[in-house]
């Protein structure tokens, strides 16, 4: 029995010596005693490959490559330690969560933290660390007691509580596992116990390679190997034997020197012979003298510069991380294409994997570079995992919309042999219905049929259901049954389950009934056929992982009774931890490795990525349960734990050294100057060190395209087709802006255009360079097919065209509309207000009452009755769907009651009486439509509904006025009237005046147009108001109507008989002077002004109608001051209007004063 050290700096050939010795022994005696090559887990695949391809080996039985865990399985299979059930990390974490829930009252700190994301994982890591460093729960308790009883210092009490809680959970976990289960750390303990009984390892030759340090559990295993194996050879990356003592903490080889000393002491304490160390001094790896110089001089002070020029060390400075990875990808393509490199000769070494993971995937896909990322990928994005999560969430949240459709959108609820495209379309339609009707809870699970009506709210009163609606309703219920039935069965089984086994059985039956294995197999076959080999394997892994998770739950917690919500929490915690296992799908691929973790063999070209300050060297990160200060306090008590942040800082130069010297031919070190958000990043001190060491090393400046990197030749950007196409388009864009480009790009363009697989894609991309965001006018026949030969239009439609012709086309030509959502929107509130006022007016007419006769209690009673009758007709009874909406309904009653009271006050003060409410005009309306013959002969009819028409008798004849109810403040802006943006009120006035004889039996004069704001304002006063008359004025003032009145004193007094000379009217926007004339600040217009406005509006209608008939659909939104047509437009995703695009500009309208508008109309000038 002996211990032999094989020592040498990186690249000295330690691994090669091991492989050569193994080869020689295999050739001498193929069936001799076992040879075990023990390496880190992440190195096993590469070592097996290297060993099997060692010249003269071929196949082998005697030698095997193991990690510590795989060796444990091999020994326990032989000696009988595998009878206990193996629990993965996922199972352990589920058990920990259960323990915390059960012992929450006894925990001092952890009870409150259990539900925080990542806490269970951190606690598991802490317990794992305790096991690796041979700390028992009892020892943790003793240390907790020591801190509790010791001097009162900051943090000691907190540390005592932490240790106490860890000990409690740790002890309970061990009690649950002992005798029945094994977790990953138990294998190492059992391996140490079972090595003496293993005939396989007795007198074996052990080679330990690739390790720089060991945990106490691993030292226990090595101790047993030393006792029972013929020879243990340990390879360490170190410059010399440290028999004479430890080097300084800042020494480059401090970490492996520490390991060397501990192994030596272990052998001496067991009376194991220590052979003379073999120290390899020659550099056998590096082919270039510059890399030999780097290996020898790294971390030496003072630095010895390498005087000669070199092509073996390159520095890349990139504008951002994407430019950095694209530059690396271009160089990889060049190496493979021009220098004959294989992808497997190349490695990317990254410390910040989270910052680069997605970038590497995206860029390497574009460049067609095969790669293997040495990092396990979480499963949470897989459809099966999402289905399980969403299905359980559906049950516990009472069928919330989000949970149900997360399950639906996995595609796994669809019938196995169904048409995927058809079912996705059906799911979209079902989702639209669920959103519009507010479907949740019992509406999914009861047997009540879902009803469908195309017409919403008050529009659909007394309209029978059409055949089209009935047909869609039938399909809707079929889709509902097909998709919801499996979830309903799952819910019934989960509700009936009495323990963990019942819950898991319900979930398994749910997946089995959906034929998930068959569906995943189909998905896997499709992925494999498309060449997506990694994805193909992931489908099978996902199914096995979910089944294994349920098995582990049943095994450990199957007999436990617990609430369904708690079961779901535990399963979700398990799902969070599921990861895809890593097996390289091909041999020739770039290795993407982590700087601190990966072990690389036979790499010729290495790219050290992201060499920024704070990354290399690394900052101390405290992301575990134990803070660095607490680890120091434990270390003072002699407690050994994993290296803390301070120790890791000492070790960091060693890992950086390993990364820099791993390539045999060329080293590239890259760093970005900004992150993804544009924040500046500083280069690592390593960059300064390398530039001093290699003053003649080339430094490359890398941008996102050829213009950003003028030093690079154009040929460097011609790589894989997908990436080259991107660069080509950027060059052509520059050419279009009159910049010069390299002639090579025209050759690239011609090559693409002549290639059958790429020409259409490139043509499409090039056409985008000349794209102008405009809309081609419709041909006459298409315009007629869309709008009809006789156009029937509302006034708001005419306004919409004036705001933006394309918005009109999208709304009335394409008939696009927003997805209806089950909530109360502003238009619904406005609709309710209108309907309530009309119902109150109808009730008064039925009871032969007048508005003037209403008292405040009458207003409140009538308003409450009206709102109660109308509410069920608004948005699928949304106002009865929740307590929140019930409260809103009460508030709406108050608004209507306040409005009704104000209207009654207006009636008492006014000589005008309503003669029409919701007065319709059109072919079948109360009044005929307003008809126009357009220039091309097309007839256009204006149709609509007027909120309220009032009449008064004056000395000059009958006066008519229009009142429009608005749920938001509104005034009549003559600038908007002039430009055709606000045509409604004057059009309504024109209609009632045009058809006055039909309406009132004689011609009439315009009294004005007014907006009445329906609201419930808070009255503000600077001091307490006791006077009732004054208070009445304060209450009426916020309801003063806005608009435009006839400039006639008699008409104004008819509108407000209470107005006093010199005072503003509380009802209309007018004031009479003390002399009885109209004040200049009043909003009034003469009869001739009204006539000019009416004529102007009519001319606008003819112009707008003519443009509609001619097929005008231009993207031309208006801009008036700070108002634009795009502000509240729902069609922006369709038109994609963008001022940055060529041809996209606002149609800017100049503001006009009231006087200027009147003057222009009088002169006959049009807007």
Curated annotation (Swiss-Prot):
Residues that bind [4Fe-4S] cluster: 804, 1126, 1129, 1135
Complex and partners: Heterodimer of AddA and AddB.
SUPFAM superfamilies given in the database record: P-loop containing nucleoside triphosphate hydrolases
Swiss-Prot/TrEMBL cofactor(s): Mg(2+); [4Fe-4S] cluster
Record note on cofactor: Binds 1 [4Fe-4S] cluster.
Its job: The heterodimer acts as both an ATP-dependent DNA helicase and an ATP-dependent, dual-direction single-stranded exonuclease. Recognizes the chi site generating a DNA molecule suitable for the initiation of homologous recombination. The AddB subunit has 5' -> 3' nuclease activity but not helicase activity.
MF (Gene Ontology): 4 iron, 4 sulfur cluster binding; 5'-3' exonuclease activity; ATP binding; double-stranded DNA binding; helicase activity; metal ion binding
Keywords of this entry: 4Fe-4S, ATP-binding, DNA damage, DNA repair, DNA-binding, Exonuclease, Helicase, Hydrolase, Iron, Iron-sulfur, Metal-binding, Nuclease, Nucleotide-binding
Similarity comment text for this entry: Belongs to the helicase family. AddB/RexB type 1 subfamily.
GO biological process: one example: double-strand break repair via homologous recombination
UniProt-recorded name of the protein: ATP-dependent helicase/deoxyribonuclease subunit B
Gene: addB
HAMAP family the UniProt entry points to: AddB_type1
UvrD-like helicase ATP-binding domain ranges (all copies): 1-359
């Amino acid at each position: 029995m002996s211990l032999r050290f094989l020592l040498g700096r990186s690249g000295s050939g330690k691994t090669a010596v091991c492989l050569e010795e193994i080869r020689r022994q295999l050739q001498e005696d193929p069936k001799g005693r076992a040879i075990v090559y023990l390496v880190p887990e992440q190195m096993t695949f590469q070592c097996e490959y290297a060993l099997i391809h060692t010249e003269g080996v071929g196949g082998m039985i005697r030698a095997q490559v193991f990690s510590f865990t795989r060796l444990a399985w091999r020994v326990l299979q032989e000696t009988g330690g595998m009878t206990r059930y193996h629990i993965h990390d996922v199972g352990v974490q589920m058990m920990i969560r259960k323990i915390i829930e059960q012992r929450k009252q006894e925990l001092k700190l952890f009870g409150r933290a259990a539900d925080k994301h990542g806490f269970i994982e951190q606690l598991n890591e802490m317990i794992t660390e305790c096991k690796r460093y041979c700390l028992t729960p009892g020892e943790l308790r003793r240390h907790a007691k020591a801190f509790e009883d010791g001097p009162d210092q900051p943090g000691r009490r907190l540390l005592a509580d932490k240790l106490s809680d860890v000990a409690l959970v740790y002890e309970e976990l061990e009690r649950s596992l002992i005798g029945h289960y094994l977790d990953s750390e138990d294998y190492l303990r059992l391996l140490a116990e079972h090595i003496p009984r293993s005939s396989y390892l007795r007198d074996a030759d052990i080679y330990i390679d690739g390790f720089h340090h060991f945990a106490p559990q691993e030292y226990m295993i090595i101790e047993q190997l030393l006792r029972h194996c013929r020879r243990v050879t340990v390879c360490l990356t170190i410059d010399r034997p440290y028999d004479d003592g430890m080097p300084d903490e800042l020494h480059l080889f401090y970490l492996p020197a520490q390991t060397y000393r501990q192994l030596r002491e272990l052998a001496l304490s067991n009376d194991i012979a220590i052979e003379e160390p073999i120290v390899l001094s020659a550099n056998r790896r590096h082919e270039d003298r510059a890399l030999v110089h780097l290996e020898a001089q790294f971390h030496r002070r003072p630095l010895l510069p390498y005087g000669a020029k070199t092509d073996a060390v390159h520095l890349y400075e990139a504008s951002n991380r994407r430019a950095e990875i694209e530059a690396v990808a271009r160089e990889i393509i060049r190496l493979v294409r021009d220098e004959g490199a294989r992808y497997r000769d190349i490695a990317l070494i990254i410390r910040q994997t989270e910052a680069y993971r997605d970038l590497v995937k995206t860029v390497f896909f574009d460049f067609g570079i095969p790669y293997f990322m040495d990092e396990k990928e979480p499963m949470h994005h897989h459809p099966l995992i999402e289905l399980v999560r969403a299905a359980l969430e559906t049950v516990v949240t009472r069928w919330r919309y989000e949970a149900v459709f997360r399950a639906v959108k996995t595609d796994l609820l669809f019938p196995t042999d169904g048409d995927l495209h058809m079912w996705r379309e059906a799911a979209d339609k079902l989702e639209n219905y669920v959103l519009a009707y507010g479907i949740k809870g019992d509406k999914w699970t009861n047997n009540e049929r879902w009803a469908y009506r195309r017409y919403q709210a008050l529009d659909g009163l007394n309209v029978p259901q059409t055949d089209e609606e009935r047909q869609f309703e039938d399909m809707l219920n079929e889709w509902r049954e097909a998709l919801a039935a499996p979830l309903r069965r799952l819910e019934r089984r989960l509700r009936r389950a009495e323990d963990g086994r019942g819950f898991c059985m319900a979930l398994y039956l749910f997946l089995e009934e959906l034929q998930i294995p068959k569906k995943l197999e189909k998905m896997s076959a499709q992925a494999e056929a498309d060449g997506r080999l990694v994805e193909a394997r992931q489908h099978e892994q996902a199914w096995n992982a979910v089944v294994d998770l349920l098995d582990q739950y049943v095994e450990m917690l199957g007999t436990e009774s617990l609430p369904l919500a708690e079961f779901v929490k535990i399963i979700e915690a398990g799902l969070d931890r599921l990861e895809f296992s890593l097996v390289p799908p091909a041999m020739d691929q770039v290795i993407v490795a982590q700087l601190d973790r990966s072990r690389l063999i036979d790499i010729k070209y290495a790219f050290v990525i992201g060499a920024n300050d704070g990354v290399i060297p690394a900052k101390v990160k405290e992301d575990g349960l134990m803070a660095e200060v607490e680890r120091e306090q434990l270390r003072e008590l002699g407690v050994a734990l994993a290296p803390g942040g301070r120790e890791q800082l000492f070790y960091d130069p060693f890992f950086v050294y390993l990364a820099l010297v791993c390539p045999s031919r060329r080293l590239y070190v890259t760093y970005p100057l900004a992150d993804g958000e544009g924040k500046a990043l500083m280069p690592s001190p390593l960059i300064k060190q390398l530039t001093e060491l290699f003053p003649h090393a080339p430094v490359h400046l890398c941008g996102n395209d050829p213009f950003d990197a003028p030093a690079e030749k154009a040929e460097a950007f011609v790589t894989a087709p997908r990436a080259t196409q991107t660069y080509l388009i950027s060059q052509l864009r520059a050419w279009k802006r009159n910049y010069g480009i390299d002639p090579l790009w025209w050759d690239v363009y011609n090559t693409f255009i002549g290639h059958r697989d790429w020409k259409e894609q490139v043509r499409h991309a090039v056409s985008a360079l000349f794209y102008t965001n405009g809309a081609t006018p419709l041909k006459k026949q298409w315009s007629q097919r869309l709008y009809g030969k006789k156009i029937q239009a509302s006034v708001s439609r005419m306004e919409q065209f004036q705001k933006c012709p394309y918005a009109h086309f999208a709304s009335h030509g394409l008939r696009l509309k927003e997805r209806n959502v089950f909530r109360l929107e502003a238009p619904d509130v406005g609709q309710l207000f209108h309907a309530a006022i009309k119902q109150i007016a109808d009730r008064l007419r039925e009871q032969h009452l007048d508005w003037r006769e209403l008292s405040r209690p009458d207003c409140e009673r009538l308003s409450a009755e009206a709102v109660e009758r109308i509410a069920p007709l608004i948005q699928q009874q949304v106002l009865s769907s929740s307590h929140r909406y019930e409260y809103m309904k009460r508030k709406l009653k108050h608004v209507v009651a306040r409005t009704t009271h104000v209207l009654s006050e207006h009636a008492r003060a006014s000589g005008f009486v309503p003669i029409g409410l919701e007065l319709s005009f059109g072919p079948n309306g109360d009044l005929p439509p307003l008809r126009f013959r357009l220039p091309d002969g097309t007839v256009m009819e204006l149709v609509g509904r007027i909120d309220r028409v009032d009449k008064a008798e004056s000395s000059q004849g009958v006066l008519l006025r229009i009142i429009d109810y608005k749920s938001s403040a509104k005034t009549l802006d003559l600038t908007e009237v002039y430009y055709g943006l606000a045509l409604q009120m004057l059009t309504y006035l024109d209609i009632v005046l045009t058809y006055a004889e039909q309406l009132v039996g004689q011609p009439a004069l315009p009294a004005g147009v007014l907006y009445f704001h329906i609201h419930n304002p808070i009255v503000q006063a600077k001091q307490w108001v006791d006077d009732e008359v004054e208070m009445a004025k304060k209450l009426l003032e916020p309801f003063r109507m806005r608009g435009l009145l006839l400039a006639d004193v008699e008409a104004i007094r008819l509108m407000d008989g209470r107005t006093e000379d010199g005072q503003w009217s509380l009802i209309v926007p007018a004031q009479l002077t003390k002399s009885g004339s109209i004040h200049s600040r009043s909003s009034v217009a003469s009869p001739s002004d009204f006539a000019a406005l009416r004529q102007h509006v009519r001319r606008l209608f003819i112009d707008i109608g003519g443009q509609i008939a001619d097929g005008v659909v231009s993207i031309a939104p208006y801009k008036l001051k700070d108002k634009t047509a795009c502000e509240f437009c729902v069609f922006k995703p369709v038109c994609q209007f963008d001022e940055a695009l060529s041809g996209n500009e606002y149609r800017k309208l100049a503001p006009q004063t009231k006087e200027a508008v009147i003057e222009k109309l009088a002169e006959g000038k049009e807007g």
